[in-house]
Amino acid sequence: MAAMASFGALALLLLSGLSCCSEACLEPQITPSYYTTSDAVISTETVFIVEISLTCKNRVQNMALYADVSGKQFPVTRGQDVGRYQVSWSLEHKSAHAGTYEVRFFDEESYSLLRKAQRNNEDVSIIPPLFTVSVDHRGTWNGPWVSTEVLAAVIGIVIYYLAFSAKSHIQA
């Protein structure tokens, strides 16, 4: 019985040591890149993709990250390469205004504080992100004012009218 109790205490100690808390990233250095949809003619939504390369001073790797964009949270996926992460989201073209979108990145600890503040209707702006990436979206192009089909039809009608009137003058 004593062996079972000591085994249980040892297991509890190991589990608490493993799940205590992941090491925080100190002085993160990022190299961001991003893509946004620019053509609204061939897509139904505007897509935003942010890729980052992250290195920490204390060499923390493969940490879980979360992104916050205008009050909406998204999970950040890890790339195959160490230190590569990506987050993406989409908005309807009407909602995706041209301008700068601030993408705030959080580690697990600060993300849990953010979610707790949201649940309690507290001010979330006081929770500092691990880092922030600014995404410049120039807006989407909705195509020409006049579609090519309409333009071709109008040109065809004008040519038909000119040919018909020329034929009438020749026969008269």
Curated annotation (Swiss-Prot):
Keyword Cell inner membrane listed: no
A Pfam cross-reference name: TRAP-delta
TM stretches of this protein: 144-164
Protein localization: Endoplasmic reticulum membrane
GO cellular component: endoplasmic reticulum membrane
InterPro entries assigned: TRAP-delta
Disulfide-bonded cysteines: C25-C56
Lumenal side: 24-143
Membrane topology summary: Single-pass type I membrane protein
Cross-link (Glycyl lysine isopeptide (Lys-Gly) (interchain with G-Cter in ubiquitin)): K72
Spans within the Cytoplasmic topological domain: 165-172
Keywords, in A-Z order: Disulfide bond, Endoplasmic reticulum, Isopeptide bond, Membrane, Signal, Transmembrane, Transmembrane helix, Ubl conjugation
Predominant location category: endoplasmic reticulum
Segment forming the signal sequence: 1-23
The UniProt record lists the keyword Protein transport: no
Record-linked PANTHER family: TRANSLOCON-ASSOCIATED PROTEIN SUBUNIT DELTA, TRANSLOCON-ASSOCIATED PROTEIN, DELTA SUBUNIT
Oligomer status and interactors: Heterotetramer of TRAP-alpha, TRAP-beta, TRAP-delta and TRAP-gamma.
Record function comment: TRAP proteins are part of a complex whose function is to bind calcium to the ER membrane and thereby regulate the retention of ER resident proteins.
Family: Belongs to the TRAP-delta family.
Name of the protein in question: Translocon-associated protein subunit delta
Organism: Mus musculus (Mouse)
Gene (name only): Ssr4
